[in-house]
From Swiss-Prot:
One of its GO terms (molecular function) is pyridoxal phosphate binding. The gene is hisC. Its cofactor is pyridoxal 5'-phosphate. Homodimer. It catalyses: L-histidinol phosphate + 2-oxoglutarate = 3-(imidazol-4-yl)-2-oxopropyl phosphate + L-glutamate. This is Histidinol-phosphate aminotransferase. It comes from Brachyspira hyodysenteriae (strain ATCC 49526 / WA1). Pathway: Amino-acid biosynthesis; L-histidine biosynthesis; L-histidine from 5-phospho-alpha-D-ribose 1-diphosphate: step 7/9. Signal peptide: none annotated.
Amino acid sequence: MKSFLSDKAKSIEPYTPGEQPKDKNYIKLNTNESPYPPSPYVKKALIESNFDDLRLYPDPNVSDLKKEIAELYNINTNNIFIGNGSDEILAFCFMAFFNRGDKIYYPNITYSFYSVYSSLFDLNEVKIPLKDDFTIDINDYKNLDSGIFIANPNAPTGLLLTLDQLEEIIINNKDNIVIIDEAYIDFAAIESAYKLTKKYDNLLVVQTFSKSRSLAGIRLGFAIGNENLIQGLKNIKYSFNSYTINRLSIIAGIEAIKDNQYFKDTVNKVINTREKTKIKLKELGFNVLDSKSNFIFISHKNIFAEDLYLKLKDKGILVRYFKSDLINNYIRVTIGTDEEMDIFVEKIKYIIKN
């Protein structure tokens, strides 16, 4: 039987999302979701939303949500692009700012969707090795000959570049676009790089509502950059679908931004739990990277990471294991509630002892 698939569809290796098994009630620490529900503002607004309006298309420009983001960050709405999750925006970046066959630079250990997009859009990826401690050497990113993607904090390591380090990369690539993927920036100890977009026209900063604003199920993200870059993203978007953001997502995004105190409180809870968990795991002999995200990246000399992942799964806890040779002795653990992380640590203790 003829397959009807294109060569690309037959050959590409797609992104592998975190597993979501249904066979038992797992403690889910594998997909970097928030352990806390969305803001009560979001719940109230969705319940009270006009059901009849769902017969109407949403605003293709997402103007009301843009206004909220612009006010929060003290920027112009013309400098904002909103997408159906930051992953969609990242995909649009690969299409808007690169031609087929172009080089594209990013770390050899980072968000694996970058490699998928490079393959999908026929770009030549150049993976720059991290240092032995998994940190980025910014000197490796100076005076390159094409665009750069940097996740900050990086994934799955959780390690962070400072704003000064990022600015040095941007300054030394004036003819290349630099895209900073800030999916986890709200859990870090530094400000977002968005302020640098006012100084540098080659910088685009991408963020998401999925992590720190507890809206992974809504699929909402945004980018900040100069009007030329934003227009490029719009050109790609409107060539696919004018209405990528649905009415309920817009409502949820607006209310999540309005409730800034809830946002701060839940982020601080995650940070506090993360730091407490780091200490406990170090006491158990784990190598714990200094993650500034809502997850930690850990290994132990006495147990192979895949075995630890499988034993935790058997005990009802899901974590993320990567088969890549460079990181196959580490697991990534999403930060849950204090109660969930206490259970995680107790299960870890049992596994190590036995």
